[in-house]
From Swiss-Prot:
The gene is Tnmd. Pfam families: BRICHOS. Keywords: Disulfide bond, Glycoprotein, Membrane, Nucleus, Phosphoprotein, Signal-anchor, Transmembrane, Transmembrane helix. This is Tenomodulin. It comes from the Eukaryota.
Length: 317
């Protein structure tokens, strides 16, 4: 009977050791489960957040057809937007008159391909669509319209030598279209826009080509009028008070102020004034809307003096 207590004590120690060991294992399993649960919850939150808040690139290609009238003719422009490659392709004309304009916002280049010329012209462009802020000052429509030059006229002159190394267009859509034709760099050149001639004097009107294709083929014709304008500009430096005018108000003719306010003619002007504004083509392209295709079109009109219209009706001009 005296040997039983030691044996019982050894059995108790063994049981206590096994219990402590099992408790440690359970505690470790609980800690591992908690860590894995936190990691799984974090991954779920990150996946959900990236799906809902991260801008997903659309794999869809957008096509659009735009119809407009130019010089009385109905024309169409086909636009294709590929968000994956960040390119825009504009197609206009048919046959030899077809023109393709590719805007590569990923690499920062623009390619213009003329099917009739079998040539491709490359120029650099921005890689990010600019954000246009609203104008700070509002234009009062009732104010008198003065001579306004909206912007300096720019022509794109091609380089004399073609592009030999085309590695910079390796991953561009431009190279797919212009791979088998000659490619040239084109650079902007400013043209000094002349002041309008006094319509009381004799003068010739200057006609500039309206299409980019004609401007490329007729670069010399674009430069000649600029030289002529600079030579004759010194003859128009007289002030408004020194210009001759046929004032028919002395004969009892009164002009309605609404003619001036609505832009039909200018009552107090002594020369024709040009008013220009930019019109954007609503092609539903990238933001901001409307999308300005080729920077928009500049539409100008000339506001003549009211006395000039009277003189014209009397046959004096």
């Amino acid at each position: 009977m005296a040997k039983n207590p030691p044996e019982n004590c050894e059995g108790c120690h063994i049981l206590n050791a096994e219990a402590l060991k099992s408790k440690k294992i359970c505690k470790s399993l609980k800690i591992c489960g908690l860590v894995f649960g936190i990691l799984a919850l974090t991954l779920i939150v990150l996946f959900w957040g990236s799906k809902h808040f991260w801008p997903e690139v659309s794999k869809k290609t957008y096509d659009m057809e735009h119809t407009f009238y130019s010089n009385g003719e109905k024309k169409k422009i086909y636009m294709e937007i590929d968000p994956i490659t960040r390119t825009e392709i504009f197609r206009s004309g048919n046959g030899t008159d077809e023109t393709l304009e590719v805007h590569d916002f990923k690499n920062g280049y623009t390619g213009i391909y003329f099917v009739g010329l079998q040539k491709c012209f490359i120029k650099t462009q921005i890689k990010v669509i600019p954000e246009f802020s609203e104008p700070e000052e509002e234009i009062d429509e009732n104010e008198e319209i003065t001579t306004t030059f909206f912007e300096q006229s720019v022509i794109w002159v091609p380089a004399e030598k073609p592009i030999e190394n085309r590695d910079f267009l390796k991953n561009s859509k431009i190279l797919e279209i212009c791979d088998n034709v000659t490619m040239y760099w084109i650079n902007p050149t400013l043209i000094a826009v002349s002041e309008l001639q006094d319509f009381e004097e004799d003068g010739e009107d200057l006609h500039f080509p309206t299409s980019e294709k004609k401007g490329i083929d007729q670069n010399e014709q674009w430069v000649v009028p600029q030289v002529k304008v600079e030579k004759t500009r010194h003859t128009r430096q007289a002030s408004e008070e020194d210009l001759p005018i046929n004032d028919y108000t002395e004969n009892g003719i009164e002009f309605d102020p609404m003619l001036d306010e609505r832009g039909y003619c200018c009552i107090y002007c002594r020369r024709g004034n040009r008013y220009c504004r930019r019109v954007c083509e609503p092609l539903l392209g990238y933001y901001p809307y409307p999308y300005c295709y080729q920077g928009g079109r500049v539409i100008c009109r000339v506001i003549m003096p009211c006395n000039w219209w009277v003189a014209r009706m009397l046959g004096r001009v």
